[in-house]
Amino acid sequence: MFVKGLEKVMDIVRSVTVDQPVERVFTYLSDFTTTTEWDPGTVRTTREVGDGGVGTRYRNVSRFLGRETELVYVVEDLSPNERLRLRGENQTVVAHDTLSFMPNADGSTTVTYRAQFELKGLARLAAPLLAPAFRRLGNEAEQGLRGALERL
């Protein structure tokens, strides 16, 4: 966790390397509805508008600390086989999710997943107490991501 201005930001970064070509990994993860298959907190993700490219809007419902929360995500950047960046928001948080893809010489792919959560309003005050839960969320997402990508 770090402080950005007056806002508390939770920053989770995880990398996984899987024995899959970058094209297959990117195609799978650039469809954000697949979060239901690899993000243990996701209850459902639906695409509302768009074809998956920049400007596409997704509605994500997740369970965090026993409560369901809904964020609307928009694809801000999509560079095939290199990067996918989305921004999600609701009344208490702004989320920035970035997935970076690196093809390796042996044909495997390394995916780096960075999730930044900027808490808003009174939720900022709880940031120090939420840090362990966000770390756990990152660990669970890493395991889910690795498992889903290995099954491709």
What spans do the regions from the language model cover?
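Hydrophobic ligand-binding cavity/cleft-lining segments
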Residues: 1-47, 53
